[in-house]
């Protein structure tokens, strides 16, 4: 909203970060893309841009970790196999997306990478955390632990 209005906290802005549904509609708002961060990250790092992960408390232990990872995977697979039902559910959170855009948006974030987190995606998360530490955004280095069938 701030970029659309040209003001944030009472100060003029002429650039911003477009996320979520805005990726599909920003041009209709009269905005233009200066840099696609996904393309920039891929070109500069040779890895996909990590968009999000699920976390679980370490103290729950490996058995619960694997069980929860399995349940999440089953849920995602169910949604992929029952796409129309999943899209109907997602529509209640869609913030103004029509059916075609909703389908495209969901496909951007729920896909084969969501089911099986490949090594390349793990490396991307590690690179993001490493870069955040090097820039002083993290107080200490963070090394993620991956859980589930595709965990290390």
Spans of model-derived segments:
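Pocket-lining segment of extracytoplasmic ligand-binding domains
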Residues: 2-92
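Generic structural motif recognizing short loop/turn segments at the entrances and edges of beta-strands
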Residues: 11, 29-31, 111, 140-143
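Secondary-structure end/capping motifs
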Residues: 61-131
